[in-house]
């Protein structure tokens, strides 16, 4: 059993901090959020709807985005390709790059970050990749975004900018689970926090 006595509730527009003492059960938790893997016992609700339970697993994915310190973006594609073309439900086959760049610009203006829309992801800084992944999640309609240990490889000023973007989207009603080993960082950003020890939640 990787998760035991594990119970968290994340409210709409909340930044929920999760502080793991060790990684035991973390991969299972993240996989469970997205993929509704079979449960021995318990329930999973997403947007107030029952999406997984111990009696029956639907094996359907939830529209939840997970951003780790190692980018999941396609390095050999552009920023706009990663955000728009690779997202689930995108069906257009012939797309003018300029049109996609114009679609992206309002999102960049909103967060006040300048990322070259036509640049290849391999050319971006780590911070720019994190921002691109957040934008990709927002465009895809994710109402819950999980960020895991993203502060490790970016500067303090970049982390402040990332926190500002998280807060902006939280005010728009998007929820976040912010996973970090640093208590001070979680205290600064998060509305509520929980401690995770050996696959259990310690309030």
Regions found by a protein language model. Give the residues of each.
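Q-loop/switch helix immediately C-terminal to the Walker
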Residues: 70, 75-89
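Conserved catalytic segment of ABC-fold P-loop ATPases
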Residues: 188-195
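Helix-to-loop junction immediately C-terminal to a conserved catalytic motif
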Residues: 34
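Conserved ABC transporter NBD signature motif
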Residues: 42-53, 58-62
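Conserved beta-strand
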Residues: 2-11, 42
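H-loop/switch region of ABC-family ATPase nucleotide-binding domains
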Residues: 180-181
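Hydrophobic anchor residue at the start of the ABC signature
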Residues: 133-134
């Amino acid at each position: 059993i990787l998760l035991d006595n594990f119970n968290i509730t994340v409210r709409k527009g909340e930044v929920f901090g999760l502080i793991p003492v060790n990684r035991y059960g973390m991969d299972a938790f993240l996989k469970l959020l997205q993929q509704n893997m079979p449960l021995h016992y318990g329930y999973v609700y997403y947007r107030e709807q029952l999406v997984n339970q111990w009696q029956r697993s639907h094996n359907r994915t939830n529209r939840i985005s997970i951003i780790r310190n190692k980018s999941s973006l396609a390095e050999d594609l552009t920023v706009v390709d990663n955000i728009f073309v690779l997202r689930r439900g995108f069906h257009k086959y012939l797309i003018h790059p300029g049109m996609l760049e114009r679609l992206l610009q309002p999102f960049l203006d909103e967060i006040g970050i300048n990322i070259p829309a036509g640049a290849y992801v391999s050319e971006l800084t780590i911070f720019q990749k994190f921002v691109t992944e957040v934008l990709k999640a927002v465009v895809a309609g994710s109402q819950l975004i999980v960020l895991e240990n993203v502060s490790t490889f970016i500067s303090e000023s970049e982390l402040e900018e990332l926190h500002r973007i998280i807060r902006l989207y939280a005010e728009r009603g998007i929820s976040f689970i912010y996973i970090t080993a640093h208590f001070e960082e979680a205290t600064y950003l998060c509305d509520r926090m929980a401690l995770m020890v050996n696959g259990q939640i310690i309030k």
